């Protein structure tokens, strides 16, 4: 359980970076889908 607790922030950061990169790539290919009224 200690190994999981020590690796949790790393996994959380990796997921945040992955999600941000995915949003940026999606916004680059489909710029009008994220900002439609």
Curated annotation (Swiss-Prot):
Function: May help in the organization of the PsaE and PsaF subunits.
Domain of life: Bacteria
Location of the protein in the cell: Cellular thylakoid membrane
Recorded GO CC terms: photosystem I; plasma membrane-derived thylakoid membrane
Keyword Thylakoid: yes
UniProt keyword annotations, A-Z: Membrane, Photosynthesis, Photosystem I, Thylakoid, Transmembrane, Transmembrane helix
Entry's family note: Belongs to the PsaJ family.
PANTHER family in alphabetical order: PHOTOSYSTEM I REACTION CENTER SUBUNIT IX (PTHR36082:SF2), PTHR36082
Cited SUPFAM superfamilies: Subunit IX of photosystem I reaction centre, PsaJ
Annotated membrane topology: Single-pass membrane protein
Pfam families: PSI_PsaJ (PF01701)
Entry-linked InterPro entries: PSI_PsaJ, PSI_PsaJ_sf
Protein name: Photosystem I reaction center subunit IX
Annotated transmembrane regions: 4-24
Alphabetical GO biological process terms: photosynthesis
The UniProt record lists the keyword Membrane: yes
